Swiss-Prot record:
PROSITE patterns: ADOHCYASE_1 (PS00738), ADOHCYASE_2 (PS00739). It comes from Coxiella burnetii (strain Dugway 5J108-111). Keywords: Cytoplasm, Hydrolase, NAD, One-carbon metabolism. SMART domains: AdoHcyase (SM00996), AdoHcyase_NAD (SM00997). GO terms for cellular component: cytosol. The gene is ahcY. This is Adenosylhomocysteinase.
Length: 438
């Protein structure tokens, strides 16, 4: 694949790898649309009303085929956008090219340097003729943090941000506590139709896909440590066990640890398993989960990867002085002084997007339908959202699920008036309290 780095000119407001990939990208976007019923339903519902007319959205989320469907949905609903990727390895260059060919300002390519990554984010915050954003759409919190720290003058015109992932939500709550958050935020991650679907079912498929593409290793019979048993860890553990691995879990939370034990997993510590496991997967959203000391103990040819947002769950920095042998894109062997080799996937960054193509379109339709609804909420009803961190109301969460039922052949039972009265709900929902745990 060519990588001639198409850059912006007087008539081209984008920076991507190769515009010649656009036709391939467009074909895959059209296929993805058939698997994203939630977004397509929003297009049909709002194509005339244009509820995002006047919105100028700066987006920072993995520039994939599925994200292309999201971007074009936002635009069909009236928004203008400028976009970068939230990970240096996650861009699908044909997706970026397909959008750039249509004149959409995209600043993303697979294999950015750190410096290029931040320059791409900066490019989304200002455009021709004084363009600046009045909404943000973020994944991981880098766009939000960059805006607050480097461009505070923009904050007074920003109606809010919708945040996609656990790591970004943690950062939002920290900023709110510190008083540095200057606009409202909607926590999309904690919508049930995001966290219980994207995080769990998405990872259940994309983790194995990425390990297989990267290594061709036999999963059956392997001892695998999954660090973290939240929704992401749960999905990873399910798929690894289904392939015949013996799965071990590390956890800090006694509730999650007990859940893992009740599912039949061994709950252990990294210190206990570092010298005996074959594959290690971090899924915590935290730092220093696999340390240099752990990696010194690991056996030859152990595989190390991360499916959390950032690259600090595994202490990759401590390996930089060792010899690295590249096997293929995003697959490296790190050779220790004693000759031992560890296989490191995606340099410790998101393995499912570095070594594969991320989650399937259908589950991303759940997440991205939430994102569109969050953007509409922030744009249409700013008076409802003083500075703070919010989740979408239950009726919208249920609506997202409802939009996806037909695609999987599911039919709902309808409550009678008597039944609805008996349990104290409206026949049309919401059917659960805000505090219900699915």
């Amino acid at each position: 694949m060519e990588n001639d780095m198409e850059t912006a000119t007087m008539t081209q407001d984008y920076h991507i790898a190769n515009i010649n990939l656009a036709d391939w990208g467009r074909k895959e976007i059209e296929i993805a649309e058939t698997e994203m019923p939630g977004l397509m339903a929003l297009r049909k519902k709002y194509k005339n009303a244009k509820p995002l007319k006047g919105a100028r959205i700066a987006g920072c989320i993995h520039m994939t085929i599925q994200t292309a469907v999201l971007i074009e949905t936002l635009m069909l609903l009236g928004a203008e956008v400028r976009w970068s990727s939230c990970n240096i390895f996650s861009t699908q260059d044909h997706a970026a090219a397909a959008l750039a060919q249509k004149g959409i300002p995209i600043f993303a390519w697979k294999g950015e340097t750190e410096e290029e990554y931040w320059r791409c984010i900066a490019s989304t915050l200002e455009g021709p003729k004084g363009w600046t954003p009045n909404l943000l759409l973020d994944d991981g919190g880098d766009l939000t943090a960059h805006t607050l720290q480097k461009h505070p003058e923009l904050c007074q015109n920003i109606r809010g941000v919708s945040e996609e992932t656990t790591t970004g939500v943690h950062r939002l709550y920290r900023m709110l506590k510190e008083g540095s958050l200057k606009f409202p935020a909607i926590n999309v991650n904690d919508s049930v139709t995001k966290s219980k679907f994207d995080n769990l079912y998405g990872c259940r498929e994309s983790l194995i896909d990425s390990i297989k593409r990267a290594t061709d290793v036999m999963i059956a019979g392997k001892r695998v440590v999954v660090c973290g048993y939240g929704d992401v860890g749960k999905g990873c553990a399910q798929s690894l066990r289904a392939y015949g691995a013996t799965v071990y879990i590390t956890e800090i939370d006694p509730i999650c640890a007990l859940q893992a034990a009740m599912e039949g997993y061994r709950v252990v510590t990294m210190d206990e398993m570092a010298d005996s496991a074959d594959i290690f997967v971090t899924a915590t959203g935290n730092t220093d989960i696999i340390t240099h000391e752990h990696m010194l103990k690991m056996k030859d040819q152990a595989i190390v990867c991360n499916i959390g947002h950032f690259d600090n769950e595994i202490d990759i920095a401590s390996l930089q002085d060792y010899q690295w042998m590249n096997i293929k894109p995003q697959v490296d062997q790190v050779i220790f002084p004693d000759g031992k080799r560890l296989t490191v996937l995606a340099q410790g960054r998101l393995v499912n997007l570095g070594c594969a193509t991320g989650h399937p379109s259908f589950v991303m339709s759940n997440s991205f339908t939430n994102q569109v609804l969050a953007q509409i909420e922030l744009w249409q009803y700013p008076e409802k959202y003083p500075i703070g961190v919010y989740v979408l109301p239950k009726h919208l969460d249920e609506e997202v699920a409802r939009l996806h039922l037909e695609r999987v052949g599911a039919k709902l039972t309808t409550l009678t008036e008597k039944q609805a009265d008996y349990i104290g709900v409206d026949p049309e929902g919401p059917f659960k309290s805000e505090h219900y745990r699915y």
